[in-house]
Amino acid sequence: MLVVQMTEDKAREHSKKRLDRTFRSSAAVKKRMSPRRNDNNVHDKTFRDGSFLKIGWPSVNIMSSSDYRFVALTDYDRFPENIDSEGDGFSLASKRTTTFMSAGMTLVESSPGRDICDSKWRRKSPHEAPPTTGILSLYNRGDRRRWYWSCPHCGEYFQPAMDAMTGYRNEPDPFK
């Protein structure tokens, strides 16, 4: 698996503060780590079963030539829009998973942080994001699935939105 943080410093920090602590603190994980010292460093973690975890940053050297079944891009809107003149992070990352065909997966997470490119844009369909770059642009490239809930009273499905959720506001909080 390849996990790509937004910078080299953040990749190092994530590895040392999160992963290394978890690996040391969990006996179950620790026994699965390779016993050879040179197999595990700040950016590379090797396990006894042969699996490999790479912690990288947006760079063509990191995001080229190696195949990964799973790639995760964190805080995507803080990535450069064009990585080393080779393209956007998602395109480069998803290319790493093509060897695994439908078993490969590219996960991207971020808070939207890019400006909308066309201030006069109007939605043409209910499942459409405005023209922009970053994580919001990936929504339009995907299959645009949304989560729908079943109404407990009539069984009809609806998209959860504040204006569609009625009838609960005057009820006491059952979790207090």
Where are these regions (language model features)?
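Phosphate/NTP-binding elements of NTP-utilizing enzymes
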Residues: 1-176
